[in-house]
């Protein structure tokens, strides 16, 4: 494993008392992995790229955490820049549970492409590789991590945000984006299945969690995200 590449493009940030974020700057956008700590256990939210740099999650675990205390991966959705690190991570931790919304299964299993796309994802899995959100096993894992799942469709059918109540932080995945100076923006159009639905969902979620800090994958952290969204031109003109 060529760790130098991963070290050069990554930044480790503590974004709240119990959550760290690893940002991998690949030039065209930022790929993020969050690590939530509770009771000396660690839970990854998303896992990084598939083909270009498939060892992002493995790099994070090997270099910064005791792998025996890594207790699960919880996915925001199944696009390849979020799910791509799973195979390499599973070579390190073969029995690691992986949680995803059931509405993502047809796309991550290669049954069909995501809405608006012609090609299947560059990496596919078996349905049994995952624990579906809403099952007793996934509920237990979320409780252990101190997280609440929030279905947030639009970017993808089963896109899910995760709210950490103790830290009042909303892990948004690709709910929205920020630019490189932290200004809130719409989801990336070319990767979003239904932009109007995505914006409607984001507005609803941010209204409900208006006091929370928003952390997004392609970008950074935003305070007062609901107010920022409401006054933005991209939302007002949508």
Regions found by a protein language model. Name each.
Residues 114-119, 189, 232-234:
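Short, hinge-like loop/turn segments at secondary-structure boundaries
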Residues 50-51, 148-153, 157-231:
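Metallo-beta-lactamase
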Residues 51-54, 61-139:
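Active-site HxH/HxHxD metal-binding segment of metal-dependent hydrolases
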Residues 68, 96-97, 145-147, 212:
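A structural micro-motif
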Residues 43-45, 74, 98, 169-171, ...:
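Residue-level marker for buried hydrophobic side chains located in beta-strands
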Residues 24-25, 131, 151-153:
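Short Gly/Pro-enriched turn/cap motifs at secondary-structure boundaries
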Residues 6-62, 161-178:
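Conserved beta-strand hairpin/beta-sheet module of binuclear metal-dependent hydrolase folds
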Residues 132, 140-145, 150, 166:
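A conserved mid-domain beta-alpha-beta active-site/ligand-binding segment of alpha/beta enzyme cores
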């Amino acid at each position: 494993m060529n760790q130098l590449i991963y070290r050069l493009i990554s930044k480790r940030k503590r974004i709240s008392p119990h959550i760290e974020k690893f940002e991998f700057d690949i030039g065209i956008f930022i790929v993020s992995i969050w690590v939530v700590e509770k009771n000396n256990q660690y839970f990854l939210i998303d896992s990084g790229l598939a083909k270009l740099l498939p060892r992002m999650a493995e790099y994070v675990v090997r270099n910064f955490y005791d792998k025996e205390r890594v207790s699960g991966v919880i996915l925001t959705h199944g696009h390849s820049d979020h799910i791509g690190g799973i195979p390499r991570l599973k070579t390190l931790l073969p029995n690691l549970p992986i949680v995803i919304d059931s509405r993502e299964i047809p796309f991550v299993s290669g049954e069909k492409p995501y809405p608006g796309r012609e090609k299947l994802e560059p990496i596919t899995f078996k349905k049994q590789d995952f624990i579906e959100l809403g099952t007793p096993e996934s509920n237990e894992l979320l409780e252990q991590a101190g997280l609440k799942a929030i279905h947030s469709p639009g970017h993808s059918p089963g896109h899910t945000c995760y709210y950490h109540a103790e830290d009042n932080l909303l892990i948004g995945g690709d709910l929205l984006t920020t630019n490189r100076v932290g200004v809130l923006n719409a989801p990336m159009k070319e990767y979003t299945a239904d932009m109007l639905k995505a914006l409607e969902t984001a507005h609803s979620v941010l209204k409900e969690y208006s006091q929370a800090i928003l952390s997004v994958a392609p970008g950074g952290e935003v305070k007062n995200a609901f107010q920022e969204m409401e006054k933005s031109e991209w939302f007002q003109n949508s």
